[in-house]
Amino acid sequence: MPEILNHTLILEKIKNLGASPGCYLWKSKKGEVLYVGKAKNLDKRVRSYLKENHPDVKTKVLQREIFDLDWIATGTEKEALILEATLIKKHNPRFNVRLKDDKKYPYICVSLSEPYPMVYVTRKLKDNGDRYFGPYSDVKSTRETLDIILRIFPVRKTRQVLPLPRPRRPCLNFDMGRCLGPCQGNIPVEDYKVIIDQVIQFLEGRKESLVSDLNIKMSNASERLDFEKAARYRDMLQRIQNFREKQTVVSLEGGDEDVIGFARKQDEGQVILLEIRGGRLETKKSFPIQGVLDAENSEILGAFFRDYYLNASLVPPCIFIPADIQDEVIPVIDVLQEKTGFRPKIKFPKGGDKRSLLKIAEKNAELGLSERLLATHYRDQTASLKEIQEMFSLERLPHIIECYDISHFQGSQPVASGVMFVEGKPFKQGYRKYNIRGYEGINDPGMIHEVISRRLQRIINEEGVFPDLIVIDGGLTQLTKACEAAVEAGAEGIPMVGLAKKREEIFFPGENEPFIFDMNSPGMKLLRHLRDEAHRFGVSHHRSRRNKETMRSLIQEVPDIGFKRSKLLLQHFSGEKKIEEATKEELLLVPGIGENLAEKILKQLQKKE
């Protein structure tokens, strides 16, 4: 039986499901909607979640949190698809793959519900006859598109209900020729509508037909000797041409297409959508995707396809996808056909120019994802450093933090490790290994004193940069000895703390009692990472040193080997590990090693095993 908290109650509920299409909602004990799904057959689909040893990792995790079930039956599978998208937007379930913050994606609105429509950016979609274009991936790109439109087309920019009871004074846009003055009643509604139709053509990507239309209108105006209107069309044509010259030609065939690229890493995904209109790359849209950790690529791309195209104002005749996900997108295509009256083609090119376009989109998705993860990491690390600064009352952010740890086996072969984190990340060039010189046996505080003394003295001698914080892996005794070393070196101003493993206690100089901070806070997570890295590095160095000394003693115990030939062996094989793996023939290649001695070496190595 799978790990479902309320298994019996859910089985009772399933009895009433039936075989109709619809949507199901898995809920937690607190009533949180965990996952929304659609099904052609609700009963069959929901029962699939009750299987033991489910092959899907994400479903196994979901099973452990399921407590309740809700469902909504629909008349058709298409209705279930539309309802699924609506429910995911409403509840934002954490087990669903979804567009990140998709409720906030901006659109460009053409307010056709007004006699003199405006063109503006909005996030609110109203069912009042206005036309919406989008969604765009961010406000910046949306405003850039809007600015281009407002430079090309002389539409009104001020938000007020027109026509006004009485004409107002013309604004600066009218004086500059960027508006035709509908607020003054200078342009009839019919003439203004012609300009709005041109804006819509532009937003729909039909720029070739728009240019052709404007050329005809300019010629007709010239023939009528309406030179003012002809000049206006000429200026619009010039601005459109300037805009088009900046666009990259990606297809000599022309045509309207969308090209989808995808990248993923950890629990984050990124989709890049290249909008090609009239053979030119018109827009690059970038969409972060959430909840991709254990999801298949087909599920992720299918979810994007659903969330984007069911809300898109325009769907091109052809869409190129980076994987064969026909099964996932066919229900969406069916709905789009009902909405638009045509069925877009979905293609998965395996070669040629279209495959090259897909690779461009995929490369852009990889770059966009890397940039986003880097920004997130930097933001998280900065938060961690700020918290550490507050925890330890530091004068400045701890840009450089060092941590020191002692490793030995019952006091033998003692070593120390020092690791350095810069801006919250490991800085491997700053890592240091130390063989303890002045202490034998178990004396961790004394060894810490030696290592800190050596480290600080080296910084002073080389005129280096002191760290902003030193963390000692240990308790109050080790920390006290480290502080003594700093005072002796004349570097007592460096902040130091001790981090004990037992309860993750923090010790401060001069304070007998430790402090305990929130284990899951960003600052403590970074400090534990630092301490664990110092421990790992120290254990690795200690193991290496112990193995070397063990090997040297083993070789020196070989009868008749002597110091000189031991040294030749180590030099020839460049290390002890290769001596362990050597054959008799390989040993004979070492100067001074004959058959008799080679056999003695092999026997000695066998004793070790």
From Swiss-Prot:
The keyword DNA damage applies. Residues 19-97 form the GIY-YIG domain. GO terms for cellular component: cytoplasm; excinuclease repair complex. The keyword DNA repair applies. Keywords: Cytoplasm, DNA damage, DNA excision, DNA repair, Excision nuclease, SOS response. It comes from the Bacteria. SUPFAM superfamilies: C-terminal UvrC-binding domain of UvrB, GIY-YIG endonuclease, RuvA domain 2-like. GO terms for biological process: nucleotide-excision repair; SOS response. GO terms for molecular function: DNA binding; excinuclease ABC activity. It holds the Pfam family UVR. Its main location: cytoplasm. InterPro entries: GIY-YIG_endonuc, GIY-YIG_endonuc_sf, GIY-YIG_UvrC_Cho, Hlx-hairpin-Hlx_DNA-bd_motif, RuvA_2-like, UVR_dom, UVR_dom_sf, UvrABC_protein_C. It is found in: Cytoplasm. Residues 208-243 form the UVR domain. The UvrABC repair system catalyzes the recognition and processing of DNA lesions. UvrC both incises the 5' and 3' sides of the lesion. The N-terminal half is responsible for the 3' incision and the C-terminal half is responsible for the 5' incision. PANTHER family: UVRABC SYSTEM PROTEIN C (PTHR30562:SF1), UVRC/OXIDOREDUCTASE (PTHR30562). HAMAP family: UvrC (MF_00203). Interacts with UvrB in an incision complex. Belongs to the UvrC family. This is UvrABC system protein C.
